[in-house]
């Protein structure tokens, strides 16, 4: 049984509230879970101490048993000092695409041609 520490959505429409739960990876998002270990209320301000509430002792026990936190929960655990989160790096994503490079080359070529024409007209 693969265990995950993940979010289960509660609350009403347009008013989300999430429970941080330990659940089997195959169970539905809001379905059966083994234990509730915290909560997250995104409607509260980021500086509010009740925005994210965690039961640190139980989370440490479940991680020791092999439960894997999801990305969002791992972010909360890292902020609380309960887990390490590796910094993401994708330098390829920042590079411009092939079409963008072609457009920039065309634009530079037109600007050079215009500059040469104005210099020739000024002589």
Swiss-Prot record:
A GO-annotated cellular component: cytoplasm
InterPro entries to which the protein is assigned, alphabetical: Ribosomal_bS16, Ribosomal_bS16_dom_sf
Region of interest (Disordered), ranges: 85-107
Record's keyword terms, sorted: Ribonucleoprotein, Ribosomal protein
GO aspect biological process, one term: translation
Alphabetized Pfam families for the sequence: Ribosomal_S16
Entry GO MF terms: structural constituent of ribosome
Family statement drawn from the similarity comment of this UniProt entry: Belongs to the bacterial ribosomal protein bS16 family.
Name listed for the protein in its UniProt record: Small ribosomal subunit protein bS16
Source species: Allorhizobium ampelinum (strain ATCC BAA-846 / DSM 112012 / S4) (Agrobacterium vitis (strain S4))
Gene: rpsP
